Swiss-Prot record:
GO terms for molecular function: identical protein binding. This is BLOC-1-related complex subunit 6. As part of the BORC complex may play a role in lysosomes movement and localization at the cell periphery. Associated with the cytosolic face of lysosomes, the BORC complex may recruit ARL8B and couple lysosomes to microtubule plus-end-directed kinesin motor. Residues 138-149 have a biased composition (Acidic residues). Keywords: Lysosome, Membrane, Phosphoprotein. Belongs to the BORCS6 family. It comes from Homo sapiens (Human). Component of the BLOC-one-related complex (BORC) which is composed of BLOC1S1, BLOC1S2, BORCS5, BORCS6, BORCS7, BORCS8, KXD1 and SNAPIN. Residues 90-99, 150-162 have a biased composition (Low complexity). Its main location: membrane. One of its GO terms (biological process) is lysosome localization. The gene is BORCS6.
Length: 357
């Protein structure tokens, strides 16, 4: 289609094609000249951008193909052709022309409705406003960067609303593709100073851009971390009517014999009685051992007491014996004098005996 329209054809063919498109886009021959058709409006913008040099960067080819525009030879033929179509294209392509007076009504009339659920947004939905309004916004973007930021934020909001309306992965991918084309168009309108980044991140948080930096703030980060760490819940079964309760199957374990329970109770009682008697005997043995220990302690105490008394009596007897010996020594002092006299007498007798011989 592009190759066939890229080359200029005969003038008659171009006029026929232009009249056919004017009838299709205009809704009939009775359409007024105050509302130009969409194809001629887009062609007027492109002719102004390419010929007048309003922007430093030309529009890309996907925009021309998505909006269904007429190629330059056809536009030249339409401009040269006298009639309402040539007047409309000239009014859409020239700034400050009388056709610009109808720009507010055109932009308000041609606002894109919100895309229905399940339908991807096309390149024409990404383009907002009429031709004159788009040219005014582009001129304001070239003059002031604040207007460019406002246009970028509006494009991001429209993209996020389109993504929220999408209910399938295919719609989401196509919406991303449409937003990418709108982002490329806005970047071309801004003179290549900044590329608008539109991604599904805007659904998960807040995306802010400062120059070349893109900041992303996630919503409910702790909840997302908790959900990512928690095991997935089991799929809930679909609600269905409650069937009649099935008969309970017979258990595989046979019924318990009551005699076994009685024997178990009797044996438990006997075991409890034996344990009680054992505990009582153990308590009596402990008491006997305690009494024996007390008797041994008392006997030891009595032995120690009697030994102490005996030692005390022996000490007292020794001291008494010493006293008696001292008394005896004092009593034997005269005997020593008698012994000396006896020795003197014996010596005298020996001397007398020697004289007698």
């Amino acid at each position: 289609m592009e190759s066939s329209r890229g080359r200029p054809g005969p003038e008659t063919d171009l006029l026929a094609v232009a009249e056919h498109q004017a009838l299709v886009f205009g809704g009939g021959p009775g359409r007024t000249s105050s509302e130009p058709p969409a194809g001629l409006r887009v062609s007027g913008e492109e002719e102004t951008e390419n010929v007048g040099g309003a922007n430093r960067h030309p529009r890309t080819s996907p925009k021309t193909s998505s909006c269904g525009v007429v190629h330059r030879p056809e536009r030249e033929a339409l401009e040269n052709e006298p009639g309402p179509q040539g007047t409309l294209s000239g009014a859409g392509s020239r700034r400050g022309a009388p056709g610009a007076e109808h720009e507010p009504s055109l932009s308000s009339r041609h606002k894109n409705p919100a895309p229905p659920e399940g339908k991807p947004s096309s390149g024409r939905d990404c383009r907002r406003g009429g031709p004159g309004g788009g040219m005014d916004v582009e001129q304001q973007e070239e003059e002031d960067n604040d207007e460019e930021a406002a246009a970028g934020s509006r494009a991001g909001r429209s993209f996020s609303s389109r993504l929220q309306d999408s209910r399938s992965l295919d719609g989401l991918s196509e919406a991303c593709g449409g937003a990418g084309s709108s982002g490329s168009a806005e970047s071309g309108a801004g003179g290549g100073r900044r590329a608008t980044i539109s991604s599904p991140l805007e659904l998960e948080g807040t995306v802010s851009r400062h120059g070349d930096l893109t900041h992303f703030v996630a919503n409910n980060l702790q909840l997302k971390i908790r959900l990512s760490g928690a095991p997935p819940p089991p799929p809930s079964a679909p609600a269905r009517p409650c069937p009649a309760p099935a008969p309970t199957p017979t258990p595989a374990i046979p019924p318990i014999d009551p005699e076994v329970l009685r024997d178990l109770e009797r044996l438990s009682r006997e075991l409890g009685g034996r344990v009680d008697r054992l505990l009582r005997g153990l308590g009596g043995a402990v008491q006997e051992l305690t009494a024996l220990s007390v008797g041994c302690i008392q006997t030891y105490r009595d032995a120690v007491d009697s030994l102490g008394e005996a030692v005390d009596m022996s000490i007292k007897g020794m001291y008494t014996l010493l006293a008696r010996c001292e008394e005896l020594e004092r009593a034997l002092q005269p005997v020593q004098g008698l012994a000396r006299q006896v020795r003197d007498i014996r010596r005298t007798l020996e001397v007398l005996e020697a004289l007698c011989k």
